Amino acid sequence: MSPAASHKKAQPNASDALFIYYLEGVIHPATPMPHPDFLGNWVEETSTFLFFGSPADDMVQGFCRSMSHLTFIDRYEMTYEQWQGGDAEPFTAGGLTITPFRKGTPPEGRPGPGDIFLDAGVVFGNGAHPTTSSCLSLLARLGPELAGQTVQDLGTGTGLLALGAARLGAEKVLAVDLNHLAVRTTLANARINGLTRQIVAVQGRAEEMVHAPADLVVSNIHYDIMKHLVVSEGFLIKKEAILSGLMTTEARTIEQVLKSKGFLIADHLSPDGIWHTFHVKRG
């Protein structure tokens, strides 16, 4: 997530605007935000990003004055489409039709057994990335094997892979993300899709939560986390995993580590030759 790489002002339409405030210092997620268009609080390590649907300069500056540990860094203004990297259209992956929508207004009707309605909110990623599609494709290839299984989705983000696993037959899915905003978004998407009985979303670190029992681990996550995850005690006792979020050099390294730990590469997808996704099984 890197707002600093985006244009600071992109002339968004008033109804489609995002106002993002970058602060050094952490504002606890439970802190009340007295603003009618407050959308979310994204905490990353020692920084906070506050999202609003309209300007909140006075309120944010007030926070910085009243909390000595906060420093205002920057303010960004853009559209939802620019934040997500484009206006997402419905797409199909793993035999599922994913229909993105925004601002809590889902498409008309209820999602069918092959449908997922996805509201990314301000959590980065609308599901169209090739790693996401590859993970869904590999989940679909498991077919009947998913029935009755418990799945972990580590680094769940918007919850799409958790939703996909549940739609494809998993009995229980534990969706994990370090960011509380991602957890909240995943829970909202589970409700919209009628999957709250199957999906539990919790805040935590992938390397720690992998210790929970599961038949299958799914993780589409940054390499800096993946390299620790695949050597963690909790991962090494797992029988099967789908791993993604890896560029070519990173994928080679992870593949070598997995093989050295006794895993077999059951499948390997890289539709664009850049991003790689592995289905691995304990040998």
Give, region by region, the residue ranges found by the protein language model.
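N-terminal auxiliary segments of SAM/dcSAM-dependent transferases
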Residues: 2-107
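A short linear hydrophobic-aromatic micro-motif
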Residues: 36-41, 148, 263-268
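A short helix-to-beta-strand connector/capping loop
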Residues: 71, 94, 112-113, 171, ...
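SAM-dependent Rossmann-like transferase core, predominantly class I methyltransferases
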Residues: 83-145
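S-adenosylmethionine
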Residues: 178-283
